[in-house]
A protein has these predicted regions:
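Active-site-proximal beta-strand elements of phosphoester/diester hydrolases
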Residues: 1-3, 107-114
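Surface-exposed loop/turn and secondary-structure junction residues enriched for glycine/proline
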Residues: 7, 43, 53, 103-104, ...
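Active-site-proximal loop/helix segment associated with metal-binding centers of metalloenzymes
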Residues: 113-169
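Conserved small/polar residues in nucleotide/adenosyl-binding loops
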Residues: 170-177
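Charged/polar, solvent-exposed surface patches and flexible loops
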Residues: 21, 63, 84, 88, ...
Length: 179
């Protein structure tokens, strides 16, 4: 959960640079990369517009995809409004729900994990509404400048209500890998 776009622009850029550095460090060894959601704090694709920013991450993902590395993106609860941008522009397969993969005769159930466990019925109801095609269609009627601003505001508001916080930059730096 990088939540790019959360907090200040500088903090978001710092997290993004660490993520890109990590991608650089694995590009010669990786065959498949699984991104497990919430790469962005808010992502909503309009038919002709996507949120601005994140150019370092998107460019690096495109580079790795162009190198032949398979990249699978499992949407999280902050970026599940993806349609076809990642597939068309970056050649990244997007999954809206967890999937079973088998590698070397071992099974792996891979996904973001939000709302899979017992309880949290309020979130599960909210997710049904927010992932409803009619609701998404209505939201697309809002101009992207207003819609993206509203989405970011609601994402921040949700964190304040739930007590959820993004991982601090200091925490990320402490766990940064050297290439």
């Amino acid at each position: 959960d990088n939540h790019l776009g959360l907090t200040s622009l500088k903090e978001s850029h710092d997290r993004e640079k660490i993520f890109v550095k990590w991608l650089d460090s694995i590009k010669h060894d990786a065959e498949i990369i699984f991104l497990l959601g919430d790469l962005f704090d808010f992502w909503f694709e309009y038919k002709e517009a996507v949120p601005k920013g994140f150019t370092r991450s998107l460019g690096k993902l495109a580079e790795l995809s162009d190198m032949g590395i398979k990249i699978y993106f499992f949407v999280g609860n902050h970026d599940y409004w993806m349609t076809d941008y990642f597939q068309k522009e970056l050649n990244i397969k997007v999954f809206k729900s967890p999937e079973l993969f088998i590698f070397n005769s071992k099974s792996f159930f891979i996904g973001h994990g939000d709302g899979l466990g017992p309880g949290d019925y309020g979130y599960k109801r909210m997710k049904l509404i927010l992932s409803n095609p009619f609701f998404i269609w209505l939201f697309r009627l809002i101009h992207p400048d207003l819609g993206i601003k509203l989405g970011r505001y609601l994402s921040q508001k949700n964190k304040l209500i739930s007590g959820s916080e993004a991982v601090s930059y200091t925490h990320l730096r402490a766990h940064e890998t050297s290439p």
